[in-house]
């Protein structure tokens, strides 16, 4: 949806002119070595090992005349803009700006309404970064003893805690909200970011996350879009709680550790899909950085599409308990109609 507004914010014909004035083979050629035997420069027909997954054969094809690429291995496809976006790990508009500079085009002024939506998202992302820092600060404070004891019991090192920016939400109702209000952030923006709740009776807002270990969820551009929180109270109604859906966060279209795993997967030629945050973090500590987790009890079709974009045959690692086996069966039911050449699944059922 966000890309839709960015498209609208650019004048008609600008993206088409940008694509026409850009050489896809030059853009891609900075990232790959062309296979000389298969490549026919005169026809604009280029082949190389895919830059998005690990392979020895040249299955990545660029049609320079049409301006499109396609990988016959991992099925990654697109144009010069999408290639820059995915290979440089930048947003759509940042990719457009990079390509425009290379093509010698000046970026036009954008539509005010569409620009307003982009500015709102940037503001929410800034609020989320403030929350990340607040939770990290609280984790290092005296009120987080139980949280630190739990993390210590899981064997996590200081380095891995810092890498994943693990934090703590205090148990009182308004600690984060008050912190953000004191920074001049408006109440409605704190709610829009998914960090606070306004009661139905119109009373004062209160923090969504209280008494929880906090895990920032970042998108592929590295921006914090949501949080996951693990309750310290064994009697809490929900052991794990995610952010509600916001302008930044669509749970069914997001993965935990997506950006890092996508990069690491190319080197490892593998992808592990774990059950939750702690599984991904533990795997990373032991060198398996190519791991992601869904943000709920079941993998959605959109998440499965994201997973297959990272690797054509991911390993689904699930606990061998009843819940884990049920999750495996649900995923099998979801995946079976979608299986095709270059898209499959492997399952690793872990012992209890």
Task: Annotate the PLM regions.
Residues 161-163, 168-169:
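Terminal amphipathic helices with adjacent charged low-complexity linkers/tails
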Residues 1-7, 20-22, 42, 116-124, ...:
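Phosphate-handling DNA/RNA-contact segment within nucleic-acid enzymes
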Residues 94-125, 129, 153-156, 352:
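Amphipathic alpha-helical segments at domain termini/boundaries
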Residues 1-115, 171, 177:
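N-terminal structured subdomain of primase-like DNA metabolism proteins
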